[in-house]
């Protein structure tokens, strides 16, 4: 893991995160023009950082937030489509991979709300991963939720997963990506004040807990409704920050992520190898007791057992100590039911 140079090497993936200014758009034509601006940014960053292999833009950076529901439907995209063609061509032209936000992606059933989607485009201009946000930021966001994570071979073989904004507040999604083999988890977010300190802290903790690189791209600026705090960052698999932007609009951070180092750590680290130890619980004591050398593999957590085997029951259980309705009468949001 290296930070401070503009290069990369056969073993290191050059990753840049962009503090992109949150746009405020209303039409498809404006979205397409913004796509062309993102393409220009890619070209400029590649010129300045010749080692760049992967560039990452925040959630909502392509469309902005459509606060008008009709505009949200009118600007929703198909994948592939005109918008992705512009972004893919920029990746191909500059020989870089890119992560881009599409808010939203048309639902398969026309009347249902769109998805909040990320795409990973390779340096040939091909879409190699499409991820739909599993945990939309309720009660404000009205995206239809996705239902799974993905892992693909990224630049130089580094294994990459994508997650979006509020997803990252749930340890389960990080662990799911890591346990599927992800070595770099990309979190694109359009996170606003007041939760700045919490969001800076959680990505470091999740990198440490899952022994993985984390790259965060967050929006900056004010869109007339929310103020976005930026702080796009790149975190090492040991939880240390390699590079972090401030609140500046269109700031960029860059680091080189070693493929060999993370694989070496996952193979040879012992006391802090959380991924291995979770599925080999207590192996030292089990071995000393003459019960084999693999530890205990079974899941000890009652909540997860219930969730998998009886999701409705798990939902009822959490409602007992939270609330039974999605809405809150003391602070209603939209037309969400409060009873």
UniProtKB/Swiss-Prot annotation:
The record's listing under InterPro entries reads: Aliph_Amidase/BUP, Aliphatic_amidase, C-N_Hydrolase, C-N_Hydrolase_sf
CN hydrolase domain residues are 13-259
- Any one Pfam family match given in the protein's UniProt record, by short name: CN_hydrolase
Q: Could you tell me which Gene3D superfamilies the record lists for this protein?
A: Carbon-nitrogen hydrolase
Q: Which residues cross the membrane?
A: none
**Its domain of life?**
Bacteria
Q: Which residues form the active site?
A: 59, 133, 165
Q: Which GO terms describe its molecular function?
A: amidase activity
Swiss-Prot/TrEMBL keywords:
Hydrolase
Catalyses: a monocarboxylic acid amide + H2O = a monocarboxylate + NH4(+)
EC number, as in UniProt: 3.5.1.4
Q: Which SUPFAM superfamilies match?
A: Carbon-nitrogen hydrolase (SSF56317)
Cross-referenced PANTHER family: ALIPHATIC AMIDASE (PTHR43674:SF14), NITRILASE C965.09-RELATED (PTHR43674)
* Known role: Catalyzes the hydrolysis of short-chain aliphatic amides to their corresponding organic acids with release of ammonia.
Cross-referenced HAMAP family, in alphabetical order? Aliphatic_amidase (MF_01242)
Q: Which family does it belong to?
A: Belongs to the carbon-nitrogen hydrolase superfamily. Aliphatic amidase family.
According to UniProt, the name of this protein is: Aliphatic amidase
Q: Which organism is it from?
A: Helicobacter acinonychis (strain Sheeba)
